[in-house]
Amino acid sequence: MTGGGEDDIVLKLLHTADWHLGRRFRSFREEQALKLSRSRLDVLDRIFLAAERSAVDVVLCAGDLFDEPTPHPEWWEQVAVRLEKRKWKDRPVFLLPGNHDPLLPDSVWANDKFRRLLPEWVHIVDREDFEFTLPNNAVLYAVPCVSRSGAGDPTESIPTRAPGDERVRIGMVHGSTFDVNDWQTNFPIALDAVLSRGLDYLAIGDTHGFRFVPADRKHPPTVYPGAPEPTAFDEKDPGSVAVVFINRQRLATVRPERVARWTWEEAWVRSVSDMRALAKRTDLVDRVLRLRVEMRVPAPEYEEMERLFEDLEGTSARHGTVGILDLDRQGLELETADVESYCNDLPEVLQSTVRRLKAAAEDPAQRQVAQRALYHLYRVSRKKAS
């Protein structure tokens, strides 16, 4: 660690953000969407366990903890229940409203029942001048989002370091930075905010991948920890929390720690060998896999592809090898040039049907239906032969 060993550390933090509890995954089938939504609660236990494992002094939760300002009670009740189970007394937790769950008069943060359920060591950041004294001569400044969008930099509400102030100063806000192209900027955070406000660590939330902002400045650091569970296929480096060690010289060392169950992956298969290789993988059980198939194969290999799809996805009687599979098989086509040679055992009337369907498959408007019918006749021929 920078500046000495464990004895030199004066403050340890766990920084998390963007839980998005209550998020719905409408592009997935109902049972898959439920599994993904529930996993957003399950990851909280792994986050809190990581805090205990690293013996942190403070847990910072930097906004968008709920996917909307007024989530169903089942979400905020479970947050309170899972926090209460930790039985922490000397490890304060700070919950920051973000732009998805801003501090509004009717929001979850104003819900008296939710507040009463929370342990006394859990603090909601409910004012723009929030300040809290931390152990070992440290202080936290935090600024909540009070609307879904805004053009002001929330760090401007954090007081600058006064002459002679030697405390470890931590900031926590939720918003966008200017280092990502084509990203909608909401509650814009200046890249030099950690410097201009005299902070030793700036904990931020909003984007869903772990990164330093800017990437080449590690001291003092501004950090997005990322969403602890991914929410989309295009996210870069989601699934972590940031564990932060600050030494006597006020230098912060930041370590990402993975807590996610799911890894989201997109894959294209364009050959049977690609598909066979995918099916042999042993790491698919915790994958959310978007699989796109694009190939044209003869009937025996088409049949093999059907079997491999079933192995990946599962059936009503057995689990598939992939945790959650989003399969697009529109690009899988039956090679019809030699399909008649596989149907010689059929009665002549069905062989005549094969020839008609083969001709129909040349028409793009009829191709898909004709190919499925030809495959069915191939299966009939196989059964007859056996």
Q: Whereabouts are the PLM-identified features?
A:
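N-terminal active-site segment of His-dependent metallophosphoesterases
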Residues: 1-77, 366-371, 379-386
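A structural signal for the main folded, soluble domain(s) of proteins
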Residues: 2-10, 39-40, 45, 49, ...
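Accessory, non-catalytic peripheral segments of nucleic-acid enzymes
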Residues: 3, 7, 246-386
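Short loop/turn motifs at secondary-structure junctions
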Residues: 10, 55, 167, 198, ...
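Conserved beta-strand elements of the Class I
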Residues: 14, 139-141, 242, 265
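His/Asp/Glu-rich metal-coordinating catalytic cores
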Residues: 33, 58, 69-223, 227-232, ...
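Short gly/pro-enriched beta-turn/loop segments at secondary-structure junctions
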Residues: 217, 236-239, 262, 284-286
